[in-house]
């Protein structure tokens, strides 16, 4: 790695750090602006004003916003996520099991979506303009156009209501056999794979086509090199950066999509935990869950940018 590539990587890491600071401030402000009073929601409408005020004092809700933000940010840096208002339990303990469930869902989806998307995207680019390419393009655009909640609802109607093959709800904590694993994860994974694969196929196809249109590929064709050799030896290595970018952007789509999927299928993941926390105005839990999603998205995008820099032939 030369000095220019190294400086670009360091610059990208610094941008990621600054972005993380801005995002943490935005998350704190967004949760602070949620309607409703946290103390009143915890105690109920029948609580006396004195009891509500006492709870507000105990939870430091009357402190200035900047002081509460600094206290929260300091805790994050020290690895202390705080205590849940609603459950009176350490947030790290609440999140740990749910985060594992969400990572399982994302991992299984990625294992399915990435090979499917790369295969269809690359072959579609190689056969550009053919019937196969047009069919792949039409299907992917159609899938991208359908909202994720529609795909999830349709899956429930088809597989759970009409065919009765799969359960409508996913109880991930009750999986003990492979068949049980398939039954629990099938519909959430199918729903997420549709959206992620469609996005990735489109971006992978565009990246490979852009590389195939470069002069050195055209020169290799004129010299009589086989199309397969050109794609494997010339096009794919130079399209690696854009393809990794496409994969990272598509997988980051999981972060938003998992919120809808976990809610519809009642999947016990971190997104479902955050939705439940919003209902009870459990601010520390909402903030911690939101930061995990933001950090996950930022890490994916940063890795994609760094791989793009390191795979650029002009920077080697």
What are these regions (language model features)?
Residues 15, 23, 112-113, 140, ...:
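Transmembrane alpha-helical core residues of multi-pass small-molecule transporters
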Residues 23, 27-31, 152, 156-160, ...:
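Juxtamembrane/transmembrane-helix interface segments of polytopic membrane transporters
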Residues 2-30:
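Charged, compositionally biased N-terminal leader segments and the immediate start
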Residues 26-33, 63, 71-74, 138-169, ...:
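Membrane-water interface segments at the C-terminal ends of transmembrane alpha-helices
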């Amino acid at each position: 790695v030369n000095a220019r590539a190294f400086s670009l990587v360091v610059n990208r890491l610094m941008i990621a750090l600054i972005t993380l600071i801005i995002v943490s401030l935005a998350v704190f402000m967004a949760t602070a602006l949620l309607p409703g009073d946290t103390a009143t929601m915890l105690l109920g409408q029948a609580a006396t004003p004195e009891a509500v005020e006492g709870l507000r004092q105990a939870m430091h809700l009357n402190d200035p916003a900047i002081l509460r933000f600094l206290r929260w940010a300091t805790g994050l840096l020290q690895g202390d996520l705080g205590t849940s208002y609603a459950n009176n339990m350490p947030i790290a303990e609440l999140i740990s099991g749910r985060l594992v469930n969400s990572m399982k869902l994302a991992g299984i989806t990625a294992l399915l979506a990435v090979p499917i998307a790369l295969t269809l995207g690359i072959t579609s680019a190689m056969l550009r303009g053919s019937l196969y390419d047009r069919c792949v393009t039409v299907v992917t655009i159609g899938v991208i156009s359908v909202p994720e909640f529609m795909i999830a609802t349709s899956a429930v109607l088809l597989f759970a209501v009409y065919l009765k093959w799969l359960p409508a709800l996913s109880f991930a904590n009750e999986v003990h056999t492979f068949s049980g694993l398939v039954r629990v994860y099938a519909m959430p994974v199918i729903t997420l794979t549709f959206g992620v694969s469609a996005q990735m196929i489109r971006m992978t196809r565009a990246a490979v086509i852009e590389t195939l249109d470069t002069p050195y590929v055209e020169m290799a064709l004129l010299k009589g090199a086989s199309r397969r050799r050109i794609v494997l030896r010339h096009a794919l290595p130079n399209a690696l950066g854009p393809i990794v970018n496409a994969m990272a952007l598509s997988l980051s789509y999981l972060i938003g999509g998992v919120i809808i999927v976990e809610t519809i299928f009642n999947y016990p993941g971190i997104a479902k935990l955050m939705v439940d926390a919003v209902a009870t105005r459990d601010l520390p839990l909402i903030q911690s869950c939101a930061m995990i999603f933001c950090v996950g998205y930022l890490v994916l995008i940063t890795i994609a940018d760094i791989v793009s820099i390191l795979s650029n032939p002009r920077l080697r």
